[in-house]
Amino acid sequence: MDGDAGSLAWIPEHAGLVFAAGSREKNSPKHATAGQAILERLIRSKTGAPVRDVRGIASIVGCHHGKSPSSFDVRSAKEEHPTSMGFDNDTWQSVQEELFGFCLDLAGIALEDLGGLARDGVVPQAASVLSGLLIMCDWIASNTYAFPLVLLDAYEIESFEGSYSYDGSYEDRALLDSGNEGIPFELFRGRAQKGWDRVNILPSWSESLSVVDSCKDLYKSRFAFPEGALLRPVQEEALSVALAVDEPGLMIIEAPMGEGKTEAALAVAEVFAAKTGAGGVCVALPTMATTDAMFSRVHSWLERLLPASGVQSGTVYLAHGKAQLNEEYQGIISENRYHMGDMDHDGEKDSFAEVSDWMFGSKKGMLSSFVVCTVDQVLMGALQMKHLALRQLSLANKVVVIDECHAYGVTPTTCICGSILMLS
């Protein structure tokens, strides 16, 4: 266990899981490493797959703190700390196996399928995205606002028909904490749903090609073009190509200044998102100044795009070091907080764009559906750094627009190529 967990140790001890001497040593493996070591052992024992095959799956758990444990750390956890792992205690092993089977049942995965997956191997890109998703789940589950560390209220249990009557007494507390079978699993589903509602993560944006009638209509409905304005050739051609391709990939739009490349890129991004099922758009620029200017244009685009897509709101994030000084962005944040705290408002807002309370900050902000950022935020998806998996998760479901891509030096260009390779 990490740190001093003595305050919570009574819970497993009451259920019969004794902490043997030496199981709480200061040099014991961190729980991410322990989780990978235990999962490797369980998959091997249940499927017979060799350790080199199961590691691809188990490492998804191992790197949920942002950094993958080394092979030496995992081997050391197994060989030098069997007591901390529970490997020399039948009761602990039984609980680990039961929890392992329970998770497989929830996921609907048969042991035969798990063994086949281990032998076939997990594609690294998929493993990284799954690791990022696990990090996200871990942070949500660790959120004490969403899941407060208090006794379950009586109404949470009594709200289910024929459920166990819980009054908060010590006997009931012991019964609940021991995992008594009389307590319905729906109770914990309800607790999870309440926590999810408190976190209030909006669904990702989705687009349909049915909203695109023609090139002219799309540009007219998404951008504030003057009456009678004609499309630039590059705008019409870019959207025509986007509509024609079956499998969107990389598009390079090259034209002189003032030809409407930004509008063309956003229109193409909408079509690409509809064809690939992407849930957002990321627009990256070279400087904070250009990023601030672009944010205003993207915000204006979103106010037309989101209602046309049939969604009530979409999450937006401005990612650079001085985003707190952008008045338009801060205005969106202030409006969100006003409507959250105003009990008298009628539910209608002036803006369709929202800044998520949870998807906010240097690590989680990029998870928002729509992101306007300096290009380094995208480049970090191709660099070896902590929480790389979370960064790749945030980019994996987006159409990424890199503006002014000709303006970068050798090193950024190399990183851009790596980012494009990752996104492909």
Predicted regions mapped to residue ranges:
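Walker A/P-loop
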Residues: E247-A269, E404, Y408
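Conserved Walker A/P-loop ATP-binding site and its immediately adjacent core
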Residues: G279-E303, Y317-E327
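Pre-Walker A (Motif I) flank of P-loop NTPase domains
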Residues: D246-I253, A278-G280, L367-S369
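Walker A/P-loop NTP-binding motif
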Residues: T262-G279, R297, S419-M422
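Conserved pre-motif I regulatory segment
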Residues: S214-E254
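SF2 helicase catalytic motif II
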Residues: L388-I416, I420-M422
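Accessory nucleic-acid engagement/destabilization modules that flank
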Residues: M1-D213
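Inter-Walker segment of RecA-like/P-loop motor cores
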Residues: P307-Q384
